[in-house]
Amino acid sequence: PVSVKTRLGYETPEEFAALLDIYNRYPIACLTIHPRVRKEKYRGPVHLDAFAAALEASRNPVCYNGDLRTVGEVCALEARFPSVTHVMIGRGLVADPALARKLRGGAGTNRKELSDFLAALYQGYTDFYQGQVPTAAQRMREVWFYLIHLFDDAEKLNKQLRRFRTPAEYERIQAEILAACPLRSDAQGDLI
């Protein structure tokens, strides 16, 4: 089976009709649609009306991908598009590593779980980059771009995260966030 991930087009959502004509010629196991065009990258609102039209016209099963960060957002999507049985979540899982568990009715995250997750991820990056700790720390900066929203009162430390120069600085800032910044109550539940 072949799956395809696509956007609505390069310049405008109207380009998708021609793309869908091509996709509909083949037995695709799952057509994952990110309802933005390429030039929008990840900015601006998703084009849900264009997604609705694509969903109706597709001959293949459709998976939704784009801006799903909370249980509430996934539930709203399911309510609006009940025929969508699959979703793809990317940055939403980086922003809330417990999101998949919460979608299955489980608990949100806690400070220890986040600390363990971040330590394992940092070590994984260090191993992957063959001991290049500065490179691993830079990768962690990218993770924190999304993850910082789980914490209250973290604005000052978030600025430091964006500007650190050494792995030791990164490690100090992360430790301070985990020790001093309150975990948002909705991080422990849902980010609605």
Question: Which positions does each model-derived feature cover?
Answer:
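Active-site glycine- and acidic-residue-rich loops that bind
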Residues: 1-18, 68-70
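A cross-family glycoside hydrolase active-site/sugar-binding cleft signature
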Residues: 3-7, 32-34, 63-65
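Short, small-residue-enriched loops and turns at beta-alpha junctions
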Residues: 8-12, 37-44
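Alpha/beta catalytic cores of nucleotide-metabolism and tRNA/nucleoside-modifying enzymes
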Residues: 16-30, 42, 49, 53-64, ...
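Short, flexible active-site loops
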Residues: 36-37, 104
